A protein has these predicted regions:
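Ribonuclease/tRNase effector modules and their secretory precursors
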Residues: 1-76
Length: 76
């Protein structure tokens, strides 16, 4: 399990699982990929800084949108 603190909206998590076949619980492991890429999400950063994390989880490349809030990684 990642050592960072993660949070997300459970309704959005269920919608993401249905649409993309990956839960936010699974997505947090993308941050552990030593070859992960973190990139700024300029398109969605007008109200707060948002980022992408692209990493490999169980053989799949996952793209995770997130922000930092009060020391916690918030997944969208």
């Amino acid at each position: 399990m990642p050592q960072h603190s993660f949070e997300w909206d459970e309704e959005k998590n269920l919608a993401n699982l249905k649409e993309h076949g990956a839960s936010f619980g699974e997505a947090q492991f993308a941050f552990l990929d030593p070859r992960r890429i973190i990139a700024h999400d300029e398109k969605h950063s007008s109200r707060e800084e948002r980022w992408f994390c692209m990493g490999k989880v169980e053989g799949r490349i996952l793209t995770v949108r997130f922000t930092y809030r009060h020391g916690t990684i918030r997944i969208f």
